[in-house]
């Protein structure tokens, strides 16, 4: 059985399923290509540069694989792998956040009383 992704990646901590692996791979690739993508976007949007250079930068951006884009990355819960209703500061979905907060496992979080 061959490797599923074009480049080897390290396994993420916490819960692992196929979606978490795919998201982790996309995160790593987006981080690796971040400088290149930023430079190409700057060149493509700079009106002071010649049109040919700008067009070549746009073509290079278009040819890059989808997994190198930050828009492909999805926030996921590190405990369950859920993608919806994730609280970004804790990287937990709402149900896991509620359970861990009730059990006192999240430092600085307590039940609201007013």
From Swiss-Prot:
Keyword Ribosomal protein annotated: yes
One GO cellular component, as annotated: mitochondrial small ribosomal subunit
GO MF annotations in UniProt: structural constituent of ribosome
Protein localization: Mitochondrion
Broad class of the protein's primary localization: mitochondrion
InterPro entries the UniProt entry points to: Ribosomal_uS14, Ribosomal_uS14_CS
One BP annotation, GO: translation
Keyword terms of this UniProt record: Mitochondrion, Ribonucleoprotein, Ribosomal protein
Family of the protein in this entry: Belongs to the universal ribosomal protein uS14 family.
Protein name: Small ribosomal subunit protein uS14m
Source species: Eremothecium gossypii (strain ATCC 10895 / CBS 109.51 / FGSC 9923 / NRRL Y-1056) (Yeast)
């Amino acid at each position: 059985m061959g490797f599923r992704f074009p480049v080897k990646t390290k396994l993420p901590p916490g819960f692992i399923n196929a979606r978490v692996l795919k998201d982790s791979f996309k995160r790593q690739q987006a981080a690796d290509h971040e400088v290149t993508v930023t430079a190409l976007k700057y060149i493509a949007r700079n009106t002071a540069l010649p049109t040919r250079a700008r067009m070549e930068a746009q073509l290079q951006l278009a040819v890059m694989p989808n997994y190198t884009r930050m828009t492909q990355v999805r926030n996921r819960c590190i405990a369950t792998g859920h993608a919806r209703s994730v609280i970004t500061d804790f990287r937990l979905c709402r149900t896991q956040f509620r359970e861990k907060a009730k059990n006192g496992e999240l430092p600085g979080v307590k039940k609201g009383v007013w």
